[in-house]
Amino acid sequence: MENNAILSALSARKSVRVFTPDPVTPDERAAILNAAFQAPTAGNQQLYTILDITDPALKAALADLCDHQPFIAGAPLVLVFLADCRRWLNAYHAAGITDARKPGAGDLMLAVADTCIAAQNAVVAAESLGIGSCYIGDVLENAEAMRDALHLPQYVVPACMLVFGRPTEQQQRRPKPARFAEKAVVCENVYTDRTPDELRADFAAKAAANGQLDYDFDKAVQAFCKRKYASDFSREMTRSAEVYWKEFL
């Protein structure tokens, strides 16, 4: 569809990790947060809390905890999105419901979905204002230290972190990486595994779209596995996620 501003923004959006010194204005911050609040939410519960990180020392601590990424500390706007199963539990208690069950795994999954939907609304709103963003998945690591740093109580779990700012000219010029084609990620009615040959074709097509014409599937996937899936930070993320999950089981 031509001349659709929302679709154009969604297609153009890419992660930005280098920002100009210009601040995110109070009006822009308010618009980004309001967009998050307007996101679809299960039962209109808004099962999340958003931390606006304004303390430079805390920004620096988060940058260190999140795989030592200094650009986090320098971002004009840093928001941590927490899956919050505590607010409604406290409301139940305040309403005199003494036998309210503790939140379970299903409640956490619903809250994480709510939280990530709100976060993506914030990303799209920022993009419409010319403000770039980057998701920081490493906020799931170092559960104990993260709980201490953010004063997280029981039944409150970090789902994602976002940094915002105006992209530099270099970041604006940087091409967005191509995605998989539809056939690689969409199944009709039921889940269907891609065959090894189909996987090779899917990955090669994406690589070609990104200008990698000499793509070697085995070499590339093995390197990615070593760098990401089998990495120390990935193992730490899994360990920390299990720490958070335990209180819901």
Can you name each region flagged by the protein language model?
Residues 1-249:
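Acidic, surface-exposed loops and disordered segments
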